[in-house]
């Protein structure tokens, strides 16, 4: 167990720093007024923390589109789902829209798009309406384009209704099912972001996250025919679950649902946050160990970065490691074999860190994947340094054969090397910057300030570097040469 007082000291340091900045600003104004009257001659005071004297104004990337979702979800005894999705879409760009573009990821796992799957998904769109009128649409792979009868002007909105049925594939990616459980990731039509006068929608890839959505509000009404435990991005789901109910999510990037049959459940309450671990194997002692680790990680991340944004943290020990608002998954079993405990625990910590880097501070995971993956690894590394009492070291030599920048778009990396850049090289080189600028304590303070400036905003690489340079008082880009591609 690390010293929790350190987190409090960091918060106190941050408050003191802001108070000091305010006092210095007031004194500077008074000095100017006095000197302008010719009464006292003052000298400019130099301060090594120049960012304390100059207010930094964060710049977020606008989403271009805004959505509120109201969805009904029904499941029959055979595992077939029926969905009625109604979304209020608002144009918050400066352009007039002739069409709407949605991600519709269930279609990627149908037989035509995933012929390698022995049990693909089934998808059937029954109707699409805009403001109550049926419209033409085109569905190709995971891209759903809906034609508008008349242009949608800036600051205007439309109501889009999509009715469809689907089944889950077996051995899909995140959107999948196994013998007992159902995992509904990106299961509804998700409006894309809009920027640079076009829809920001990229082709689906089987590695990395290719979907990018803005913060939205959700209301999900569900009805199940089977006795399943429902776990979701809402704080309203309970254990044991009922067969029907309403789930609400506010200011979240997407809405995840898992349906589990008879999981082993470990539950603890830490302050006003309930942590729940759902295990699907018989390693009950491991599930308890994961709970202890999750409590430590949540406490550290809250003390270091900022408040956890939900009332529940659900950890599902099944399926691949992945983050969703309020939920993380980590595969305790891979290809029929139990995953070793250390790997599983590391996976859980990384995904919990994503609740801040992705869940609260947003970035485009196709064009700036390193900003959430690299920062999640960076924060996890700091946690383990405290948790295990180990010194953090830099090993640049490990990445000498990987010369590309870490902030390229996913399609600019080979599938084999993509993770090495996004997860590995990014956090290693970022740690080198802090190693040469006051080290671990500075890194922890930075994460808190970063969160405070960009919570519920979207950031890109250039803005991250602008903030980092301001925070560390860096006068040039020499620290980023060779690993960051900066726009001039």
Stretches found by the model and what they are:
Residues 327-336, 368-406, 480:
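Post-HExxH zinc-binding segment in Zn-dependent metallohydrolases
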Residues 220, 246, 264-355, 359-364, ...:
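Juxtacatalytic substrate-recognition/specificity segment
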Residues 28, 37-82:
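N-terminal, polar/Ser/Thr-rich
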Residues 126, 163-256:
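Extended, low-hydrophobicity, Ser/Thr/Pro/Gly-biased non-transmembrane segments
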Residues 49, 99-133, 185, 223, ...:
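Solvent-exposed beta-hairpin/edge-strand motifs
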Residues 426-488:
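Amphipathic alpha-helical substructures
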Residues 89-93:
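Asparagine-centered strand-capping/turn motif at beta-strand->loop junctions
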Residues 117-181:
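A surface-exposed beta-strand-loop module
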């Amino acid at each position: 167990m690390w010293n929790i007082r350190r987190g409090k000291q960091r918060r106190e340091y941050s408050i003191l720093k802001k108070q000091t900045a305010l006092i210095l600003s007031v004194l500077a104004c008074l000095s100017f007024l006095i000197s302008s009257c010719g009464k006292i001659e003052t000298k400019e005071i130099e301060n090594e923390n120049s960012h304390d004297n100059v207010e930094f104004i964060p710049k977020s990337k606008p989403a271009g589109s805004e959505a509120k979702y109201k969805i009904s979800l029904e499941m029959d005894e055979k595992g077939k789902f029926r969905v009625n999705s109604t979304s209020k879409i608002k144009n918050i760009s400066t352009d007039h829209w002739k069409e709407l573009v949605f991600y519709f990821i269930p279609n990627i796992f149908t037989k035509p798009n995933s012929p390698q799957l022995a049990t693909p998904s089934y998808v059937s769109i029954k109707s699409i309406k805009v403001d109550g009128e049926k419209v033409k649409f085109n569905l190709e792979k995971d891209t759903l384009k809906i034609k508008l009868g008349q242009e949608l002007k800036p600051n205007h909105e439309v109501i889009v209704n999509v009715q469809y049925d689907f089944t889950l594939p077996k051995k899909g990616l995140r959107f999948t099912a196994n013998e007992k459980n159902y995992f509904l990731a990106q299961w509804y039509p998700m409006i894309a972001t809009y920027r640079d006068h076009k829809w920001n929608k990229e082709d689906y890839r089987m590695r990395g996250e290719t979907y990018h959505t803005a913060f939205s509000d959700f209301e999900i009404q569900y009805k199940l025919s089977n006795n399943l435990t429902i776990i979701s991005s809402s704080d309203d789901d309970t254990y044991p679950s009922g067969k029907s109910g309403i789930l609400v999510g506010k200011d979240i990037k997407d809405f995840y649902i898992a349906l589990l049959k008879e999981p082993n459940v470990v539950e603890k309450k830490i302050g006003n946050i309930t942590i729940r671990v759902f295990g699907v194997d018989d390693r009950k002692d491991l599930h308890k160990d994961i709970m202890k680790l999750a409590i430590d990680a949540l406490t550290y991340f809250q003390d270091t970065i900022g408040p956890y944004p939900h009332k529940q943290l659900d950890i599902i020990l099944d399926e691949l490691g992945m983050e969703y608002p309020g939920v993380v998954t980590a595969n305790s079993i891979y290809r029929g074999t139990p995953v070793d405990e250390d790997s599983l625990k590391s996976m859980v910590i990384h995904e919990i860190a994503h609740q801040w880097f992705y869940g609260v501070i947003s970035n485009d995971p196709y064009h700036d994947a390193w900003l959430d993956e690299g920062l999640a690894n960076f924060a996890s590394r700091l946690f383990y340094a405290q948790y295990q009492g180990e010194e953090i070291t830099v090993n640049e030599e490990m990445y000498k054969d990987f010369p590309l920048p870490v902030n390229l778009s996913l399609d600019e990396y080979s599938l084999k090397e993509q993770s090495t850049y996004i997860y590995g090289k990014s956090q290693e080189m970022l740690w080198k910057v802090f190693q040469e600028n006051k080290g671990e304590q500075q890194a922890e303070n930075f994460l808190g300030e970063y969160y405070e400036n960009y919570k519920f905003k979207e950031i890109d690489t250039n803005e991250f570097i602008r903030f980092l340079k301001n925070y560390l008082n860096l006068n040039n880009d020499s620290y980023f040469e060779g690993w960051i591609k900066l726009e001039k």
